[in-house]
UniProtKB/Swiss-Prot annotation:
This is ATP phosphoribosyltransferase regulatory subunit. Heteromultimer composed of HisG and HisZ subunits. Keywords: Amino-acid biosynthesis, Cytoplasm, Histidine biosynthesis. The gene is hisZ. One of its GO terms (cellular component) is cytoplasm. It comes from the Bacteria.
Length: 418
């Protein structure tokens, strides 16, 4: 028992100083973009009823949920993602809301990932949901916002893959396979696993094997959509391709098409997606930094009303790793002025501190009887730009000013402090 006193549970992280500051800074930049796009904040409980959180998310994420039983015998769980809690909240207030709603959040989510994956079990996310609007323009707006959000974080080298749940659903229906076979084929297509597809089609009679193998290669720029049209012959997939073409027009008009690829085998882990889906990647990271899509049936499962919606979530820790991989210098907490003072000199020191803070400077105050060279060197290494010492003020009426190179200047009070 005692060995756990100093440790966090597996997959949970504690962040101090520079890393914590950087994660906050990334969130603040992205949140600023959300605000510019008129997305308003929403806050939902970290702990909810299990049955509420499992609506539409799929078996994989149900198995990864942290579950509890409260004192009244209810099964509760920590949220594994934010879309279902937001859908429940909107459904609960649907008669009071003016649609469409543009909502934003930043919150931790919890998934019991297997230890060998090396993934965190507490994941810091920031994201948006556009609820109550169904159009190519709405889909494009959310993708454009994802691009601008990632750019605001400082990322320069990233791509967004766009697909459509309806495209693969149409392909599977055309193959006339069972539901379980269809889901397996989707996973193979998504992984570009041609070996498994060939093996499966050698055991099960499927006429359109060449068509299926051709679909595996449907990834690239706009020409992919034209190639796809020649491979499919069902209305559902055709409509999906038309949706993608219209969304792409908006992305071109806004000037973010250079960030976009099409991947028509793309599927997302959550079962509630019904239309456009997308994921963002950056070089040298083996996982997505952002993902989202359209879910037009989820809110119906809560309130019985058809309310279309689309959104995305960004993994803050993954964005930070992406920035480091791109060789970017991440900011560290800055202290503009550190004021050190003895008890006897507290009054003039506190007056100076108040003045600096009114000027918008970050001020660290430390009460200490004397300042030596070791103290100065240690704090200048942490990024302190200037040290002002009142420690000798009571004896010689002098103020010691030390700049970021360690140069010392003695000042007499009366004029303005530097």
């Amino acid at each position: 028992m005692t060995e756990n006193i100093l440790n966090s549970p597996g997959g949970m992280r504690s962040y101090l100083d520079s890393i914590a500051f950087q994660l906050e800074e990334i969130q603040d930049r992205i949140k600023g973009v959300f605000r510019q796009w008129a997305y308003r904040p929403i806050i939902t409980p970290t702990l909810e009823y299990y049955e509420s959180l499992t609506t539409g998310i799929g078996e994989k994420y149900k198995k990864q949920m942290y579950k509890f039983i409260d004192y009244e015998g209810n099964i509760l769980a920590l949220r594994p993602e934010m879309t279902a809690p937001i859908a429940r909240t909107v459904a609960n207030k649907i008669d009071e809301l003016c649609l469409p709603q543009r909502l934003s959040y930043r919150a931790p989510v919890f998934r019991y990932e297997e230890p060998q994956t090396g993934k965190n079990r507490e994941i810091y996310q920031i994201g948006v949901e556009l609820i109550g609007e169904k159009s190519p323009g709405a889909d494009a707006e959310v993708i454009m916002l994802a691009v601008e959000s990632l750019k605001s974080s400082g990322l320069t080298d990233f791509q967004i893959d766009i697909g459509h749940a309806g495209f693969l659903n149409g392909v599977i229906e055309e193959l006339k396979v069972t539901d379980s076979q269809g889901e397996q084929i989707k996973r193979w297509l998504n992984k570009k696993d041609m070996v498994s597809i060939r093996d499966f089609t050698s055991r099960v009679e499927i006429k359109n094997i060449n068509k299926l193998l051709g679909i595996v290669r449907l990834r690239g720029k706009k020409e992919v959509l034209q190639r796809a049209k020649r491979l499919i012959n069902n209305d559902k997939s055709k409509k999906a391709l038309k949706d993608l073409e219209l969304v792409y027009e908006y992305l071109c008009d806004y000037g973010v098409d250079n960030y976009v690829n099409f991947d028509l085998t793309l599927i997302r882990g959550f079962e509630y997606y019904t239309g456009i889906v997308f994921e963002a990647f950056t070089e040298n990271l083996g996982y997505t930094i952002c993902g989202g899509g359209r879910y037009d049936s989820l809110i119906y499962q809560y309130c019985g009303k058809e309310i279309p919606a689309i959104g995305f979530a960004i993994g803050i820790e993954r964005v930070r790793l992406g920035l480091l991989n791109q060789g970017q210098e991440l900011e560290t907490p800055e202290i503009d002025v550190m004021v050190v003072f003895s008890y006897q000199a507290r009054k003039p020191a506190l007056e100076a501190i108040k003045k600096y803070r009114k000027q918008g400077l970050n001020v660290l105050q430390i009460e200490k009887e004397e300042v030596d060279q070791e103290f100065i060197k240690k704090h200048l290494k942490t990024g302190v730009k200037k040290i002002i010492s009142f420690c000798e003020y009571s004896s010689n009426q002098k103020i010691k000013v030390i700049d970021d190179r360690g140069n010392i200047e003695l000042l007499t009070p009366g004029g303005d402090l530097p």
